[in-house]
A protein has these predicted regions:
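Conserved ABC ATPase "signature" region
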Residues: 132-151, 203
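Helix-to-loop junction immediately C-terminal to a conserved catalytic motif
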Residues: 70
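Short helical segment in ABC ATPase nucleotide-binding domains corresponding to the A-loop/adjacent helical element
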Residues: 117-126, 136, 140, 244
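Conserved ABC transporter NBD signature motif
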Residues: 78-89
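Catalytic Walker B motif of ABC-type/P-loop ATPase nucleotide-binding domains
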Residues: 180-183
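The feature captures the beta-strand-to-loop junction immediately N-terminal to the Walker
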Residues: 55-57
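Conserved signature/switch motifs of ABC ATPase nucleotide-binding domains
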Residues: 154-157, 175
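ABC ATPase NBD coupling module
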Residues: 31, 87-105, 126, 132-136, ...
């Protein structure tokens, strides 16, 4: 048994892929010779098929951890595994980016000069493993499943921000990834659009059962979407506590009115506030 802090399996299905295991990971930045420890001996397991919400103070190292999983940044020490296969470790400090892990960015990454359907089809077309017809058939089908029928031949700038977010998620799923990595994807959306996107994401998740590693500062978002929350410490980043969200899936927004939802919210807010105050006090001392 790994020493990693482990979340309970979200789904009892041995066929699911995308289990993440993070073992004793350290990340140290060294700008101008001044070492900054961003991640400090982080241990965590995320079972395949789980929606894992990562919550913690701003600047604590959450995105650094996501970037290491994605293969954007190296780690200083430790190991990260995907389905028991090494992504990065002592002999390989930086993971190879791959179609099995796809990032949905905070600021979006659609090509504005391509139509939405062409954006969705772009990745598989570049890979060249399927025929163009098969790729576009799949793209049309997935856009329809995501409520995007009628938007296929529009450009990203011609649809709402919420619909653009859906297009980005569909594009991310086109290569059948094991893991979707979200870095505050709905931060810029208004509350009503964000609510619609939450329910749309869950609908997409229920159909695809992909592992989701999702960074957010929005506690309501975290509890509504997640099977459980990983509360991170102030910098350097490591898990402080796992909060189980024992509200059955599928969910809709009626769960927000339940006493149990508010109980989880109170527990989570207390934990995050404690770490945010530590981060603030550390900043005051540094200043």
């Amino acid at each position: 048994m790994s020493a990693a802090m482990k979340t309970n399996a979200a789904l009892d299905n041995d066929t699911l892929k995308g289990a993440i295991r993070i073992e004793d990971v350290v990340k140290i930045y060294d700008p101008d010779g001044a070492a900054v420890v961003a991640v400090d001996h982080c241990n965590l397991e995320v079972p395949a098929g789980e929606i894992c919400m990562i919550v913690g103070p701003s600047g604590c190292g959450k995105t650094t951890l996501l970037n290491a999983i994605a293969g954007f940044h190296s780690i200083t020490s430790g190991s990260i595994y995907l389905d028991d296969e090494l992504l990065c470790g002592p002999s390989k400090p930086k993971a190879d980016p791959g179609a099995d892990r796809v990032v949905v960015f905070q600021n979006g990454a659609l090509f504005p000069w391509k139509t939405n359907i062409d954006n969705v089809a772009f990745g598989p077309l570049m890979q060249g493993k399927l025929s163009k017809k098969d790729i576009y058939d799949k793209a049309y089908s997935m856009m329809a499943d995501a409520g995007l029928s009628g938007s296929e031949h529009s450009f990203p700038g011609e649809i709402s921000s919420g619909l653009r977010r859906r297009v980005e998620i569909v594009r991310a799923l086109m290569n059948d990834p094991k893991v979707l990595l979200f870095d505050e994807p709905y931060r810029a959306l208004d509350s009503l659009t964000k609510s619609v996107m939450h329910e749309a994401l869950l609908e997409i998740y229920y159909k695809n059962k992909v592992t989701i590693f999702f960074i957010t500062h929005d506690l309501e978002e975290a509890i509504f979407l997640g099977h459980r929350l990983i509360i991170m410490t102030s910098r350097p980043c490591k898990p402080k506590k796992i909060v189980e969200v024992d509200i059955p899936h599928p969910r809709d927004y009626s769960v927000l009115t339940s006493p149990h939802f508010h109980k989880i919210m109170a527990e989570t807010k207390a934990l995050v506030t404690e770490e945010a105050l530590k981060a603030f006090e550390a900043g005051e001392k540094e200043g």
